[in-house]
UniProtKB/Swiss-Prot annotation:
Source species: Escherichia coli (strain K12)
Protein name in UniProt: Ascorbate-specific PTS system EIIA component
Keywords noted in UniProt: Cytoplasm, Kinase, Phosphoprotein, Phosphotransferase system, Transferase, Transport
Job description of the protein: The phosphoenolpyruvate-dependent sugar phosphotransferase system (sugar PTS), a major carbohydrate active transport system, catalyzes the phosphorylation of incoming sugar substrates concomitantly with their translocation across the cell membrane. The enzyme II UlaABC PTS system is involved in ascorbate transport.
Domain PTS EIIA type-2 per the UniProt entry, residue ranges: 6-150
Disruption phenotype: Cells lacking this gene are unable to use L-ascorbate.
Swiss-Prot/TrEMBL induction comment: Induced by L-ascorbate. Repressed by UlaR.
Length: 154
């Protein structure tokens, strides 16, 4: 499942969302996947449990979080949601706070998680200007067009 296709098919993009805490921000992304029947509601708690156990493991770059749990924690099919925040939030990460872009990932197996999910997200942000381009997006179509341009350039 490609990042772009998943976002388009599942209508799982939310731009300029408002959240007071990192937990609320993560819930917005998970709720989009629940609505699209990609994950069960318990996936959210699994992500919170992971943070309690390992710290903010999914804050992977300055401003960027990739919340995800394990396949057996309620994943029905592979999918992604993308959320940008109106106001960046602290996720208690030493190097990469504050966060205002969240790409929530659900993968049916570890292989898909690593090869498909992470590589597509790395590809999107290989050009660091794409962080600001994404922050500037105000419509779902603008996000999809940005991903299309990135894929065409790769």
């Amino acid at each position: 499942m490609k990042l772009r296709d998943s976002l388009a098919e599942n209508k799982s993009i939310r731009l300029q969302a408002e959240a007071e805490t990192w937990q609320e921000a993560v819930k917005i992304g998970v709720d989009l996947l629940v609505a699209a029947d990609v994950v069960e509601p318990r996936y959210y708690q699994a992500i919170l449990d992971g943070v309690e156990q390992f710290g903010p493991y999914f804050v992977i770059a300055p401003g960027l979080a990739m919340p995800h749990g394990r396949p057996e924690e309620g994943v029905k099919k592979t999918g992604f949601s993308l959320v940008t925040l109106k106001k960046p939030l602290e996720f208690n990460h030493d190097d990469n706070d504050p966060v205002d872009i969240l790409i929530t990932m659900a993968a049916v197996d570890a292989n898909t998680h690593q090869e498909v999910g992470i590589m597509q997200i790395v590809n999107l942000f290989e050009d660091e200007e794409n962080f600001d381009r994404l922050r500037a997006c105000r419509t779902e179509q603008e996000v999809l067009d940005l991903i299309d341009r990135t894929n065409a350039a790769a």
